Amino acid sequence: MGFPRILSKNNKIYTKLGEFCLSGDSFWIVCHTCQEELQTQDQFWKHIQDEHNFLHGVAKEHSRTSSYCLTDVEAAAAATTPGATASSQGAGSVTAVTVPLALYHCSAKYSDDEQREVELHEAHQQQQQQQQQQLHQQQQQQQRDAAKELAELHANAVAAAAAVAAASDGSARSSSGIDIKVEPATLALPPDMQAAAAAAAAANATIYHLPQLVPAPAPPPTASFVSASGGSTSTTVSTTPPSHQPIMQQQQHQQQQQQQQQTSTTLAMSVNQSTAIAAAALLTGPDLPKDSNSTTASAGSAVSSDDGERWYICDYESCGLKFKYKSRMELHRVVHSKERRFNCDLCSASFKQSCNLSTHRKKKHAMRGIKSELLPQRF
């Protein structure tokens, strides 16, 4: 099991902590500290760890009740093997170990001062535990009291709400013309319950702020509804006055319509002003030059040759180049203008022709693409 053992002459194995006893088929281990017999090595190892605080060959703390000391072991060895000492003396330098080895030397007794300190420490720990238990019990009691108070307040609020509802029902019945006397429910309640009911009623009360409305004149009675059945005619005239709620709704609707009309008129006025300013700016603007930067060919630039083919001539100053297609001439006129329609999507460079843009992309950005990908900028 990881600890040293020595074989003696009487077929017993002695260790620092226990004695392995073999007798026929039976096997047990006797602990040197407490003389307890154990059946297996695992039980013995667990016993010395749990009972005697022995871990990995080192004893951390010596037990007070232990009587296992080096002097006791030597006395027991001298009593059991009296011839061992003589044989060892006759052999000279050779010594035979036949007694169990003591793990450590134990002190004779604990001093009274140490025992008192230990007792005081234990008493202090017990006192702290008792104080903690008392505090815990007090906290639990406070929580229970708070829960009870909340339950009582809830019950009082429910009772007050029921009383207010009953009082409102009674007032409604009395206003309807039925003479029913309802005694307030707060008469049978104690003073504290009455105060809680009054507070709940004040909290539940709702104040409605109604706008001051000018009373409208009474409308004329509605037209009579005539229903003819056969030869008899019955006329029913309804003289029920309209309620105040439809009047309020109509007035609110009229106010909303007026506000919408005002906002629409202000918007229309602002739009008219802006359009008038823009038109005046266009009318008073400078005259455009004759040689504009437009890329479209005029109708007079198309000329027919002697062989019947139609040519498009550039009419920019003294250029005079001829093109077979109108689109080619439009692309050519960009050269004369300052317009740069082809912009690089990777930098801020712009060019007049797509071929220049493709060359720029190949040289500067190492990009190759077809001409259809180079789209001019649209204004």
Curated annotation (Swiss-Prot):
Its GO CC terms? nucleus
Protein localization: Nucleus
Renumbered to this chain, the Basic and acidic residues biased-composition regions fall at: 114-124
What protein does this entry describe?
A: AT-rich binding protein
Zn finger residue spans: C2H2-type: 29-52, 312-336, 342-365
* Low complexity: compositionally biased ranges: 125-143, 223-242, 249-262
The question of whether Zinc-finger is a record keyword is answered with yes
Task: Extract the Gene3D superfamilies matched here.
Answer: Classic Zinc Finger (3.30.160.60)
Organism expressing this protein natively? Drosophila willistoni (Fruit fly)
Please name the PROSITE patterns in this protein's record: ZINC_FINGER_C2H2_1, ZINC_FINGER_C2H2_2
Q: Does the keyword DNA damage apply?
A: no
Per its database record, what is this protein's job?
May be a transcription factor for genes having (A+T) stretches in their promoter and/or enhancer regions. Binds to AT rich DNA.
The record's region (Disordered) falls at 114-148, 221-267
**SMART domains hit by this protein:** ZnF_C2H2 (SM00355)
